[in-house]
């Protein structure tokens, strides 16, 4: 029985942190194969389908190419670290982290645009803990899905210091690359070099044009200053932990 061809690397997140741009950038490299469908969601929504289902997304892989899966829900999904370790123990893991307050607001506006959030900003954040209650038990099942865990996890997804340790406990440092989303857009050439080195790709010069994806519509300018300040206060432990433990500041 032939060995299944499965991803060499994964983009774990974060949602609203530039993973669409990351996907477009990496897809330009001749040694990289990515499915046309950016978010495969095998380790989150389709785990019950089995590895053969996952491998089917990579049937068009050419000899010598490295393949990946960029699904930003993985970083936040409580079962993803162990599932990935079991199937892909040597995979390289990419993480883009955005300013926590900016990320929270971006997800809120994204959910509202898609019709997934009927509440206003303040009410949606206030309802989050109740909406997410019991999610981990549901998600422990191979076929488990929890709509609010995926769509209404505004503050929770931005608490990076609660998510990263689960990955670091299972994967050695050399398999995990953590980058600031902002650097992807302000210094793409440098990030491009780091990505190629981390993934073991033949260096290709950066073309100099960054794909534009999911551009905002200025909605964040409408956020009341007091709400933004409150969010910063709520996420203060995250800012401190990321600066102290990872050298990432916002």
List each language-model region with its residue ranges.
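Structural motif corresponding to alpha-helix initiation and N-cap regions
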Residues: 48-51, 77-78, 161, 225, ...
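Surface-exposed cleft-lining segments at the edges of enzyme active sites
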Residues: 139-156, 215-227
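Acidic, metal-coordinating catalytic cores used for nucleic-acid/nucleotide bond scission
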Residues: 72-76, 156-157, 183-187
């Amino acid at each position: 029985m032939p060995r299944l061809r499965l991803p060499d690397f994964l983009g774990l997140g974060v949602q609203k942190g530039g993973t669409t741009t990351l996907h477009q950038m990496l897809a330009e490299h001749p040694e990289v194969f990515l499915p046309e469908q950016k978010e495969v969601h095998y380790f989150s929504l389709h785990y019950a389908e089995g590895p053969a289902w996952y491998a089917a997304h990579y049937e068009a892989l050419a000899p010598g190419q490295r393949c990946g899966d960029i699904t930003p829900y993985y970083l936040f999904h409580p079962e993803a670290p162990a599932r990935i370790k079991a199937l892909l123990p040597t995979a390289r893991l990419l993480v883009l982290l955005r300013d926590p307050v900016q990320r929270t607001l971006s997800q809120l506006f994204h959910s509202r645009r898609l019709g997934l959030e009927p509440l206003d900003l303040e009410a949606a954040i206030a309802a989050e803990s109740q909406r997410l209650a019991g999610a981990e038990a549901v998600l422990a099942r191979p076929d488990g899905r929890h709509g609010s865990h995926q769509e209404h996890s505004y503050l929770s997804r931005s608490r990076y210091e609660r998510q990263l340790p689960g990955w670091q406990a299972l994967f050695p440092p050399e398999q995990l690359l953590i980058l600031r989303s902002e650097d992807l857009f302000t210094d793409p050439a440098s990030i491009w070099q780091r990505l190629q080195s981390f993934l073991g790709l033949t260096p290709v010069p950066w073309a100099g044009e960054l794909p534009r994806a999911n551009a905002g519509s200025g909605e964040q300018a409408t956020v009341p200053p007091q709400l933004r300040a409150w969010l910063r206060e709520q996420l203060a432990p995250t800012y401190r932990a990321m600066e102290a433990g990872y050298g990432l500041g916002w």
